């Protein structure tokens, strides 16, 4: 019994529009080369909040709050063909998207 090979792709970005465009580009490339795609699965967002003092010296009650939201997506490519792997290696994604690939 042969074990099927899967490729798991995790994408992270601060801007969800860029992330969704990159995800759609990967899905279209994989489907065009004959692979089956599971996903994109939206993963929970990571929200980091920072509180800083407005003034440099006194007035502790005056503060600013900032946050960074990290959006994540998960893709599984089931039984990829060699053409799929080549197409994914040559794919040029937008700047600001972090890609992690596990085979």
UniProtKB/Swiss-Prot annotation:
Q: Which SUPFAM superfamilies match?
A: Ribosomal protein S10
**Superkingdom in the source lineage:** Bacteria
BP GO annotations: translation
Cellular component terms, GO, for this chain's entry?
ribonucleoprotein complex; ribosome
Listed GO MF terms? structural constituent of ribosome; tRNA binding
Could you tell me which Gene3D superfamilies the record lists for this protein?
Ribosomal protein S10 domain
**Which keywords appear in this protein's UniProt record, sorted alphabetically?**
Ribonucleoprotein, Ribosomal protein
Task: Say which family it is in.
Answer: Belongs to the universal ribosomal protein uS10 family.
The record ties this protein, via NCBIfam families, to: PRK00596.1, rpsJ_bact
Subunit text: Part of the 30S ribosomal subunit.
Q: What does this protein do?
A: Involved in the binding of tRNA to the ribosomes.
Q: What is this protein called?
A: Small ribosomal subunit protein uS10
Q: Which organism is it from?
A: Jannaschia sp. (strain CCS1)
């Amino acid at each position: 019994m042969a074990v099927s090979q899967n490729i798991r792709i995790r994408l992270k970005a601060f801007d969800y529009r860029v992330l969704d465009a990159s995800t759609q580009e990967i899905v279209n490339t994989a489907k065009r080369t004959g692979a089956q795609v599971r996903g994109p699965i939206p993963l929970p967002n990571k929200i980091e909040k920072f509180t800083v003092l407005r003034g440099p010296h006194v007035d502790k009650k005056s503060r600013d709050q900032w946050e960074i939201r990290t959006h994540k997506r998960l893709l599984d490519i089931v039984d990829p063909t060699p053409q799929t792997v080549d197409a994914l290696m040559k794919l040029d994604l937008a700047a600001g998207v972090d890609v992690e690939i596990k085979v």
